Each structure stands twice: as C-alpha cells, then as structure tokens.
Amino acid sequence: REMSVNSHLNAVIFSESFNEQYEKTLPIISNYYSEIGANKPLYMAIKGLNNVNLNNQQKHIVKETIRGFELSGVGLEGKASERYKAIQEQLSILSNQFSKNVLQATNSWKKIVSLDDLKGYGKDELLKIKDSEKYVLNLQIPVYIDLMTYAENRSLREEIYLAYISRASDVGITPKKFDNQTVMNEILELRFEMAKLLGLSNYAEYSVQSKMVESPQMVIDFLENLIKLSLPQAKKELNELEAFAGHPLKPWDLMFYSEKLKQKIFDFKSSDLKPFFPEKSVFNGLFSTIESLYGINLEEISEESYHPDVRVIKIESKD
C-alpha cells in the first residue's frame, strides 16, 4: 500500500528531489515482492487450500494467487531464480525511467500564443491556459484536447499534435535527452528473457496468463476481426467528414471537424453539457453510487494534503 502511495505521488507532484528518493525505493520494493513470489512454503500452503471447501469467489482468489506465484518464478532454482529477481528489479527501474521521460518531455514544451491564434475557443477553454496577460499552451491532455477540438488555426493544431505524439522520442520538438528508444529496447529484451526463464516462448504468452484470452493468437484474431468489421464504417465516416470539411483531412483535423459536424447536425456543443453537470452534483452522484455499491459511507473532511486542489475523503463501513 505504501508503494502505491509513493508511486501515485511521484506521478502527480513529480519533482527531481522526490523522484530521486522514490527511485531509491524501487530495488527494495522489487526485492521484497520477488522474495514473496519465490517463497515455496507459502506457495505450497496456498496450493493446499485447493483441498478446502471454498465458495466460488474464494476458489478464484486461490487460483489467481497460485498463478501469481508461478508467474513470479516460484518454480525456478539457483541461478535462474537469481536472474529472474535481477530482471524484475531492472524492469521496475526501467519502467520508472520510461514514465519519467514521458512526463519530463510533456512538461518541457510550452508555447505562448495570442488571442488571435485561439479563434474557436470559448471562455472556459481560454481560462485553462491564461497566465497573467498571456495564453500559454502545453502538452497536458486537457489543453491538448481543447486545442484539437476548438482551435481554428490549423497550423497550430498540427504543431501541438506532432509535439504531443512525438514526446520522449528521437523525433519531434521535445528534447532528445528524454528519448525512450533505448529504455524500450532494454524492456523488450528483459521481458523476453523473463518469459523464457518461465518456459514461455515470448512475453506475449506471459502477458495473457493473467487475462481472459488463452493465447496471443486469440488477441491477434480478435483485433483482425475487429478491423474487418469496423473499417468499412470508419471509412464511411471519414468520407463524410472530409466532404463536410471540403478537403482531405490530417490527424490534427479529425477532432476539430468532428466537433464542427456535430454542432451542425445536432445544434449542440460538448460545452453545452457543462451547466447540467455542476461539480457538486457530480461528486454527490459519484459518492452515492460508490456508497450503494460497496456498503460504505463517504465524507469529505478538512485535512492537509499534498496539493490545494486535492479533496480528502473519509471512508467508513456502514456496519
């Protein structure tokens, strides 16, 4: 639980100093979970629960726990076991580095624009990017979606689209020092080696062990069938959108013209929904649903947190 808190904080209030301390915990946590996963007495004890009279939910938990042990290398011995632990530790470090690079690349890009550049924006969209007397664009997802949806300036849409999709790579305009290519290659190699240690052909086979599908081929077949069924409709809708726009469309045009077409057909804008979903009503509805589903009470309380926008919720059982 403590690791989940640390991981969350590292993502939402990232700083070099916090991340430096967070990275020091990764090998410790990785080794902790590796030791549990390789604990044969614990594994055998849980396997013994198969002979106990359990309900369906309990049987499922036992089954998933046993599978978790087996995917954690509990059956490995000697050097193979040690290598598996080393791979797990290195993967935890590389995964953090990957996320860190994406985050820093995202935060590195900013562009000051004028009000004339933002034709098509409403008051709410302008407020998100107003900084003193300037308007500052960035690659955070709310700003990105607003620009793709409402900005009439096509060249500006193209610029931010290319900046967004090329983050943490060796192309585009974000700093090359955040390029994730080497990190991804190392992750791929280690995942392949990890799968081979467990007697699997590749990491895809490892990944599907804990999913509903039985094999990577089932995933491929599903996706190919999905393409076959959806592609004709996708082409039809693209043709309709291009006919409406009056010219061939690029990726940075799709959200913009989709919104325009929706406004024309339905006389409706996405922002028209906002008055019907005030913040207080949305939270009340969310709390009511959660309380009903899980038999708990939720109460917002005044408590110091890591950011002024964070709300602290007290959770109690109805029992």
Describe the residue ranges of each PLM region.
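Short, charge-rich amphipathic alpha-helices with coiled-coil/heptad character
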Residues: 5-16, 150-171, 210
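Acidic, low-complexity proline/glycine-rich segments
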Residues: 47-64, 138-159, 191, 196
